Each structure stands twice: as structure tokens, then as C-alpha cells.
A protein has these predicted regions:
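Electrostatic, structured charged patches in enzyme active sites and in nucleic-acid/phosphate-binding
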Residues: 1-131
Length: 131
């Protein structure tokens, strides 16, 4: 059985904060009810546990990790709620869950030039063609 941690508790616990070995993902595999396979992978560079919610995420993580230009990989990274609500409003679409729910991206990667790249890993059959 999954145990969901409230967004308020996650903020108190500083989940979704930190960098490198000190990063704690915003969503843990123990609180996620997946139709697929969740994985906890030990990162061989930082020693930190990486929480992947699907086989696709695990495969993408390995591709990211083998690229030496990726200096930090943070999974289940929380997005700024004010920005996601604004984007939904501008596009005329309903913000997922309630408007106070924190959304995440599957991976936020810091490159060696300090640029940030966000990745969402989805199976193509789960994509919605209406947007």
C-alpha cells in the first residue's frame, strides 16, 4: 500500500530541495502507485538513491548519467506552483489536481555550462494529443 506525503509535509521535510548527494526527490517510490515498475537506483557518482517511477524513467536516468556534461540530475523535481497555474490559465486548460497541488518534472538536469534542462518521460500511449 502506498503512503502519500502531503505537500505541506514535503515542504517541512525539504523534499525537492538540495543538489547533488544532498537532493531529496519531491516524490518517493514508496508513495507512488504505478501501473509499471518503480525503481530505486544508487547513483554511482553521488551515492544517492534515485527514485524512478517507471522503467522508462530508469532508462532515461541511465542515459543522462552516462553523459559527462550532466553534472547534476534531480528526479521528481517540484515546479513553481504559481508558474504552472499561470501557464494553465494562459493555455485555457485546467490545472491538474487542485490549484495548490505541486506538479513535478521527471528530471531536472544541470549541464556543465550551468544551464538547466527539464525532462518528462512518458509512454507514447499515455500522451494526450489534445494540447
Amino acid at each position: 500500500m502506498t503512503r502519500r506525503i502531503s505537500d505541506k509535509s514535503k515542504q517541512i521535510l525539504h523534499m525537492g530541495e538540495g543538489k547533488g548527494k544532498d537532493y531529496v526527490p519531491y516524490i518517493l517510490t514508496s508513495e507512488f502507485n504505478s501501473l509499471g515498475t518503480t525503481s530505486i537506483i544508487t547513483d554511482w557518482k553521488t551515492g544517492r538513491n534515485i527514485h524512478c517511477m517507471s522503467q522508462g524513467e530508469a532508462m532515461w536516468y541511465f542515459l543522462l548519467r552516462w553523459d559527462d556534461s550532466n553534472i547534476d540530475i534531480r528526479e521528481q523535481f517540484p515546479l513553481d506552483n504559481k508558474i504552472t497555474v499561470k501557464i494553465a490559465d494562459e493555455l485555457g486548460i485546467k490545472h491538474p489536481q487542485d490549484r495548490n497541488h505541486i506538479m513535478t518534472t521527471d528530471f531536472l538536469v544541470t549541464k556543465s555550462d550551468n544551464s538547466l534542462h527539464a525532462y518528462s518521460v512518458k509512454v507514447d500511449k499515455n500522451l494526450n494529443n489534445q494540447i
